[in-house]
C-alpha cells in the first residue's frame, strides 16, 4: 500500500480554502496586450502550500475573483509559519501601459512580537515593464512566542491616476513568531531576532552588541566605552584621545604629539626642540632650517648669512660692506666703486702746440681743486 504524503497543518488549511482564494494562472507565457499582472510564482507557491503553480492576484488590470471577498477569506487563512520569514510577489506592466503603486500602510498590530513589515522596493513608484519581484518581510523580534497580526495596504493606479478595480486592497495577515536565544546573549539593549542574531541599537555593534561606536574613532589606543565617549590611555586626552599630555614643554614652536615626544620645526632637534641643527648660529636674522643650513633674510647670503649682497655688485675696486653698500678702494668712489678720483683732469684735452710740463697742473693745484660733480665724470 502506498504511503500517504503528510502535509503540515498550514498547508492543509490553505488547501481547504483554495477554491475561494486562488485563481491559478493558466497562461504561463508572456502577458498579452497592455495590462497589469501580479502573481505569486510557482516556486513561492510551492514553498507556501506545496502546490507548484502560479497564483494570479491581478490579471489584465483587474483583481482576481478570490479577492472580491478577501476579508471573509482571510479570516480562515492560517498564520504564516515560524520558518517563513518573507513572501515574494511578481508583477509586470506589459506593453506600453503605465501603472503606479503606493504602499499606504505597512504596519504591525503586535509590535511586541513583530516589527512593521518591510518591502524591497520604494513605497511609492512605477510598476516595472519587466517581471520583477516584490518581497514582503515579516521581521519577528524574537522577544516572545506568539502570533502577530500585520496590515498591508496597497493602491495601484493607471496612467490617468485612477485606482484599478477593488484597490486599495487592505489585507490583514498573521505571522507565528517564537522567542529566540542568541548564544552569549545581546548586550546594551540589543535583542535576539528569530534568526538568533543580535540586532543592536544605534551606537553599538558586534556579535553581542558589546562594542560601542565612537565617531571619530578613539586614537592612540583609546577605548570606546559608550557611543561617542573614549577612555584614553595615560599621556593622552581629548574627545577621541588625539592630544598628547607632555610632561615637558616643547620649545621654539615645537608641538607635542606623544608623551615626551615633540615635533620640531625645521632646523631644530632634541626632545624639547631645544637644540639647533646649525652648530654655529645663523647671523643677521637668518634661521636654521637644516643641518648647518640657514635661511637668510633679504640682503644676506652664505652658509651663516654672514655675507651681505650688493646688486649689481661692487666691481673690481670695492667690496660689499652692507646690503647694497659698497666699500671702495683708495682712489675709487661711486655707488659701485666704478669712478676714479681725478679721472676728468687726467684725461682732459691739451691745447694744440702746448708742452707737456707747461700745461700739466701741479700736484698741489690738483689737490686743491674741488672735484666736479660725479655725474660729469667720464668712466
UniProtKB/Swiss-Prot annotation:
Residues 178-210, 211-242, 243-274, 274-306, 307-338 form the EGF-like domain. Keywords: Developmental protein, Disulfide bond, EGF-like domain, Glycoprotein, Repeat, Secreted, Signal, Wnt signaling pathway. Gene3D superfamilies: Laminin, Wnt, WIF domain. One of its GO terms (biological process) is positive regulation of fat cell differentiation. GO terms for cellular component: cell surface; extracellular region. Residues 348-379 are annotated as: Disordered. Residues 1-28 form the signal peptide. It holds the Pfam family EGF_2. Its main location: secreted. It is found in: Secreted. One of its GO terms (molecular function) is signaling receptor binding. Induction: Induced during the differentiation of CG-4 cells. Residues 38-177 form the WIF domain. Disulfide bonds join 140-177, 182-192, 186-198, 200-209, 214-224, 218-230, 232-241, 246-256, 250-262, 264-273, 278-288, 282-294, 296-305, 310-320, 314-326, 328-337. InterPro entries: Dev_Signal_Modulators, EGF-like_CS, EGF-like_dom, EGF_extracell, WIF, WIF_sf, Wnt-inh. Glycans are attached at residues 88, 245. Residues 356-373 have a biased composition (Basic and acidic residues). The keyword Transport does not apply. Interacts with MYOC. Binds to WNT proteins and inhibits their activities. May be involved in mesoderm segmentation. This is Wnt inhibitory factor 1. It comes from Rattus norvegicus. The gene is Wif1.
